Amino acid sequence: MGQDYTPTWSFLTNHAQVLICIAHDPGVRLREIGETVGITERAAHRIVGELAAAGYIWRRRNGRRNHYTIQSHLPLPDPLAREQKIGDLLAILAGEQRSETER
């Protein structure tokens, strides 16, 4: 593996990448999420639905658009990182600043 090697895989799941998109823009459109993550709009819709069903995001209609709120106080669903919170991950990956009440 030389310096020109570009992996075809990612450390971050599509779910994590969708959360990062929402953290950057809570009013982001599913089409924009798909374009940014490199998935179809339908896949973005499915992932947002899964995140909402699991309680990691709240979806609220705002006119013709959705507005998302990330529940940053919830633990990560991964067995090796259950002591960490969603907000901890986003603070690192999305540069999110959290208030003391979210910690």
Per-range role (PLM):
Residues 16-21:
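Pre-recognition alpha-helix immediately N-terminal to the DNA-recognition helix
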Residues 42:
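Key DNA-contact positions within bacterial/archaeal DNA-binding proteins
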